[in-house]
């Protein structure tokens, strides 16, 4: 049976999460969907036993494989590597740390039957970020989301849990996509030739963002700087270099707003 669905998981030192992610993903699918699905880990040469872990799961009958990169690093380029090598026409990206529930993946694929691009959103009624998420992470996430608002109508453009129909990626010049940015979903939302009709362009699937169970968070000051640089490039791409002043003004207003909110949180 031909592959119709591909799940891409960028990974670095995530050996302990590979087995639970794989088993939960396929257990959450109907038998029919599972037969048409492949799982691809894109690993940046972790050398932590991830390759052996994936091979063991493949020998157990799971349709899973691993791509090991030795000359490249970075989340966005890893996602793109997996997308371009995927066999399916419906693609989903998710984190390896189980903060994106594998059981929700079938809902993203179902949404992709009706939409060009689908996002898992943490900002729908009744769901959201786990209550144990630190306040500073919530503030950073909300601020980043607000700064991306002029670029897309999506409620959660910062989500790393998303999917797309591969044909839209194939219709975009790879040179136009910044593979060094941190938020690849936002990059693709801004640059792919998605339908003009928002009803078919973007779908959203609510999910609750969980707490990492194994490994360490990749969030750092360097990542935040990369995101700000990516935002600048996307603003220029969408609005033109002459309107860069709008980006700077928006940044400044948002900066003072966040400082105000943090002041009241602390004092």
Curated annotation (Swiss-Prot):
GDP-alpha-D-mannose binds at residues 10, 12, 14, 42, 44, 95-97, 99, 122, 183, 212, 218. CDD domains: DPM1_like. Changing residue 141 to A: Reduces specific activity 2-fold. InterPro entries: DPM1-like, Glyco_trans_2-like, Nucleotide-diphossugar_trans. Its cofactor is Mg(2+); Mn(2+); Ca(2+). It catalyses: a di-trans,poly-cis-dolichyl phosphate + GDP-alpha-D-mannose = a di-trans,poly-cis-dolichyl beta-D-mannosyl phosphate + GDP. Present with 1885 molecules/cell in log phase SD medium. The keyword rRNA-binding does not apply. Mn(2+) binds at residues 97, 99. Keywords: Acetylation, Endoplasmic reticulum, Glycosyltransferase, Magnesium, Manganese, Membrane, Metal-binding, Phosphoprotein, Transferase, Transmembrane, Transmembrane helix. Residues 2-238 are cytoplasmic. This is Dolichol-phosphate mannosyltransferase. Interacts with the C-terminus of SAC1, thereby sequestering it to the endoplasmic reticulum in exponentially growing cells. Under nutrient limitation conditions, this interaction is rapidly abolished. Residues 260-267 are lumenal. One of its GO terms (cellular component) is nuclear outer membrane-endoplasmic reticulum membrane network. One of its GO terms (biological process) is dolichol-linked oligosaccharide biosynthetic process. Induction: Repressed by aspirin. The keyword Lyase does not apply. It comes from Saccharomyces cerevisiae (strain ATCC 204508 / S288c) (Baker's yeast). GO terms for molecular function: dolichyl-phosphate beta-D-mannosyltransferase activity; metal ion binding. The chain crosses the membrane at residues 239-259. Belongs to the glycosyltransferase 2 family. It is found in: Endoplasmic reticulum membrane. Pathway: Protein modification; protein glycosylation. Its EC number is 2.4.1.83. It holds the Pfam family Glycos_transf_2.
């Amino acid at each position: 049976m031909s592959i119709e669905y591909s799940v891409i998981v960028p990974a670095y030192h995530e050996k302990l999460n590979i087995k639970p992610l794989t088993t939960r993903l396929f257990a959450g699918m109907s038998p029919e969907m599972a037969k048409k699905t492949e799982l691809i880990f894109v690993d940046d040469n972790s050398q932590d036993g991830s390759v052996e872990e994936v091979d063991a799961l493949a020998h157990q009958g799971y349709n899973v494989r691993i791509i090991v990169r030795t000359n490249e690093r970075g989340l966005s380029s890893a996602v793109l590597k997996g997308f371009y090598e995927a066999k399916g026409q419906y693609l989903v990206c998710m984190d390896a740390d189980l903060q994106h529930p594998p059981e929700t993946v079938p809902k993203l694929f179902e949404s992709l039957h009706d939409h060009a691009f689908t996002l898992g959103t943490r900002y729908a009624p009744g769901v959201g970020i786990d209550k144990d998420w630190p306040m500073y992470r919530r503030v950073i996430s909300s601020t980043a989301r607000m700064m991306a608002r002029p670029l897309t109508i999506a409620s959660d453009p910062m989500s790393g849990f998303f999917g797309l129909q591969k044909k839209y990626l194939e219709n975009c010049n790879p040179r136009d996509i910044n593979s060094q940015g941190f938020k690849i979903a936002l990059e693709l939302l801004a640059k792919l030739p998605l339908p003009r009709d928002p009803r078919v362009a973007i779908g959203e699937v609510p999910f609750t963002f969980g707490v990492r169970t194994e490994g360490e968070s990749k969030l750092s000051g360097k990542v935040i700087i990369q995101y700000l640089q990516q935002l600048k490039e996307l603003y220029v791409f969408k609005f033109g270099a002459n309107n860069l002043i709008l980006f700077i003004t928006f940044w400044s207003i948002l900066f003072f707003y966040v400082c105000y909110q943090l002041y009241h949180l602390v004092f």
